[in-house]
């Protein structure tokens, strides 16, 4: 067990780690190259804990005991009695290596060295040490006391006992330890690439604007924040750097391709909240959203003809249209007056219209994939008559639920984003980076998704996810970005749950 913990770096991460372990009963010493930063961090933690007392979350006695356990370490040598030292300094390989070299000269040989790096190789940091076996990754998420996850990263030469001890320490502090090998992005930053890069791809293709994409993903699949809100909150410079880093570390695998538009916005200083403008504008720190378009009511004169890919979902859509008082056609083919409402899964509208030999001027797509009680999505295609688009929008918004109209896209917005998340996480499982159930819990804890990838697959159906990916890949001419993971494909083909494990490789 670890009882004396040193922390190097008194920024947001370092002070959060200090508070976490002091609250868990550990003696903590906090060091920073700037002595003023240590004082600021300890004062910040004291004020935060005092607010906890005021709200009844801890007693005055617990406050005093916790503060007593957090001590300043003005000199690095003051950490010499620690049995664990966690670095939380600048994200720079040479700086971290230099720190660990100096720490090795001051600490006992059995003291464990942990790095809080979010993107650098733990193995490369440890390579500078005389005893790389005592080095491991211990990656927390900000704010540390509230984000109940820590990635415990095995470097190539990390001692298994070091990993076990860090796991136990995390559990003592009430955090979920996700053990992961030393791979690009570790676990969470790796899995999170699907949400961010797919949203950027949708924007770059002119399918929808940033605010539309955010609204669709909040109100359909139920994400707490849209991807572009998240870019603005995190800072696009930081997010784009992570996207580029993961892409390069995986040797330009198309799954991780970042956005050239994001690079341009970074160069222009459109970074989000911290610069007052990103994908949204900010005044006094408050986001300014563009008002949603208000459509003039019109008379729906045309009947609707629905495709019949899914009988249950078709019934829900028919009931919605009947509620608007529209006429529905039930024939196998549409009449010459009917608006054809199609429901592609993974295909774009143009492909499905051509496949079904439907009249392009009268055909528009509706997304039945995600819940549509809060927001609905129509997808136009280049040949559509705008007057008929307006009638479709009127009919589907009669009950006050807003309707987004986007341009033609394989998989709309929700389908392609959710399918990309599930697919990437299946690939992570295939590579042995994490067990699917561990991955599921880690993602919901760290990223705040409404469901983990397994939850998404269970809710929407793994078979439907595979169908979306296969159709998208076909629409994009076989593009490798959308290739289905073997993990997903095999389990769907064999009717197995995505949690079904592979057997360990012998040897």
Regions inferred by a protein language model and the residue ranges of each:
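Rossmann-like NAD(P)-binding element
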Residues: 37-40, 51-113, 120, 322, ...
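NAD(P)-dependent Rossmann-like dehydrogenase/reductase catalytic/cofactor-binding core
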Residues: 24-26, 175-182, 210-409, 416-420, ...
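Rossmann-fold NAD(P)-binding glycine/threonine-rich loop
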Residues: 98-147, 154-167, 340-389
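Glycine-rich Rossmann-fold phosphate-binding loop(s) that bind the pyrophosphate
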Residues: 10-11
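Conserved acidic E/D residue at the C-terminus of a beta-strand in Rossmann-like folds
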Residues: 30-33
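N-terminal Rossmann-fold NAD(P) dinucleotide-binding loop
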Residues: 14-15
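Aromatic pocket-lining residues of Rossmann-like dinucleotide-binding sites
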Residues: 21
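Beta1/beta-strand and adjacent pyrophosphate-binding region of the FAD-binding site
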Residues: 2-6
């Amino acid at each position: 067990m670890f009882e004396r913990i040193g922390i190097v770096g008194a920024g947001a991460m370092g002070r959060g780690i200090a508070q976490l372990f002091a609250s868990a009963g550990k003696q903590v010493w906090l060091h920073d190259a700037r002595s003023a930063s240590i004082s600021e961090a300890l004062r910040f933690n004291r004020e935060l804990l005092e607010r906890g007392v005021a709200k009844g979350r801890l007693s005055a006695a617990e406050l005093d005991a916790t503060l007593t356990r957090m001590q300043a370490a003005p000199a690095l040598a003051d950490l010499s009695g620690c049995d664990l030292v966690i670095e939380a300094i600048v994200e720079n390989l040479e700086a971290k290596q230099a720190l660990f070299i100096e720490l090795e000269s001051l600490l006992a040989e059995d003291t464990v060295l942990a790095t809080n790096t979010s993107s650098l190789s733990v193995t490369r940091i440890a390579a500078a040490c005389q005893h790389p076996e005592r080095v491991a990754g211990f990656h927390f998420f900000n704010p540390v006391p509230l984000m109940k996850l820590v990635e415990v990263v095995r470097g190539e030469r990390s001692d298994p006992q070091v990993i076990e001890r860090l796991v136990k320490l995390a559990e003592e502090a009430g955090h979920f330890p996700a053990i992961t090998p030393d791979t690009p992005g570790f676990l969470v930053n790796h899995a999170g690439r699907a949400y961010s890069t797919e949203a950027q791809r949708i924007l770059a293709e002119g399918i929808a604007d940033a605010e539309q994409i955010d609204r669709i993903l909040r109100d359909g699949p139920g994400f707490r924040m849209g991807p572009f809100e998240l870019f603005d909150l995190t800072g696009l410079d930081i997010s784009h750097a992570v996207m580029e880093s993961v892409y390069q570390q995986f040797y330009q695998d198309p799954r991780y391709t970042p956005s050239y538009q994001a690079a341009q916005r970074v160069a222009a200083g459109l970074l989000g909240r911290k610069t007052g403008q990103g994908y949204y504008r900010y005044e006094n720190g408050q986001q300014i959203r563009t008002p949603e378009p208000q459509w003039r009511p019109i008379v729906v004169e045309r009947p609707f003809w629905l495709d019949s890919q899914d009988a249950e979902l078709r019934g829900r859509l028919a009931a919605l249209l009947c509620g608007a008082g529209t006429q529905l056609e039930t024939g196998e083919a549409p009449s010459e007056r009917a608006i054809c409402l199609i429901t592609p899964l993974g295909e774009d509208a143009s492909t499905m219209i051509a496949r079904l030999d439907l009249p392009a001027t009268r055909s528009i797509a509706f997304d039945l994939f995600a819940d549509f009680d809060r927001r609905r999505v129509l997808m136009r295609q280049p040949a559509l008559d705008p007057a008929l688009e307006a009638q479709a929008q009127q009919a589907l918004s009669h009950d006050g639920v807003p309707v987004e109209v986007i341009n033609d896209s394989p998989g709309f917005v929700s389908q392609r984003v959710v399918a990309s998340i599930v697919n990437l996480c299946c690939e992570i499982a295939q590579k042995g980076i994490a067990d699917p159930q561990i991955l599921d819990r880690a993602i919901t804890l760290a990223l705040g998704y409404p469901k983990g990838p397994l939850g998404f697959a269970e809710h929407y159906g793994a078979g439907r996810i595979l169908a979306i990916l296969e159709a998208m890949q076909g629409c994009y001419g076989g593009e490798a970005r959308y290739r289905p993971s073997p993990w997903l494909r095999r389990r769907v083909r064999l009717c197995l749950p995505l949690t079904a494990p592979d057997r360990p490789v012998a040897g």
